[in-house]
């Protein structure tokens, strides 16, 4: 009986910790439109900042740039941060500042809608940093 209660308590604590973690997670699907004449250079900046962020920042779960098949100037970046604090730290990094300052003149339009994960538990199966 004691072991059963301990197991139940551990499951509740585990669930509570996971719920708290998921409440603080930041998920965005950045929508960026780049001027055609700057597309090649923009993609180089984007690939560099995304790679360095995932490699060097523990709180960056995912930065995954994608290009529209219909319009190559439309970029989408799946951004997942472990917390608001991780996102704020990311904004202060040298590699993000290099990207931000280096691409200001290249970006025609930018939207940063925040998304709400429908199944945050599945993220642990997809993203290694969430395990």
Per-region residue spans from a language model:
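Glycine-rich beta-strand-turn "strand-cap" elements at beta-sheet edges
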Residues: 4-5, 20-27, 64-71, 100-131
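Hydrophobic h-region of N-terminal signal peptides that target proteins for export
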Residues: 8-18
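Alpha-helix boundary/capping residues
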Residues: 11, 46-49, 94, 103-106, ...
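Short, well-ordered beta-strand segments in beta-rich or mixed alpha/beta enzyme
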Residues: 25-33, 62-91, 129
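N-terminal targeting signals for Sec/Tat export/insertion, comprising classic cleavable signal peptides
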Residues: 26-56
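Short alpha-helical
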Residues: 37, 48, 70-72, 82, ...
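An amphipathic, aromatic/His-enriched active-site/gating alpha helix that lines ligand/cofactor pockets
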Residues: 52-62, 80-115
């Amino acid at each position: 009986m004691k072991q059963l209660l301990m197991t139940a308590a551990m499951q509740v604590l585990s669930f509570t910790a996971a719920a708290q973690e998921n409440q603080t997670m930041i998920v965005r699907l950045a929508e960026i439109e780049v001027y055609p004449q700057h597309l090649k250079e923009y993609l180089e900046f984007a690939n560099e900042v995304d790679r360095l962020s995932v490699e060097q920042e523990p709180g960056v779960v995912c930065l995954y740039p994608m290009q529209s098949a219909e319009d190559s100037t439309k970029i989408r970046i799946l951004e997942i941060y472990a917390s608001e604090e991780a996102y704020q730290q990311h904004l202060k990094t040298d590699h993000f500042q290099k990207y931000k300052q280096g691409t200001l003149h290249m970006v025609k339009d930018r939207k940063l809608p925040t998304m709400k994960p429908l199944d945050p538990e599945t993220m642990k199966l997809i993203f290694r940093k969430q395990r």
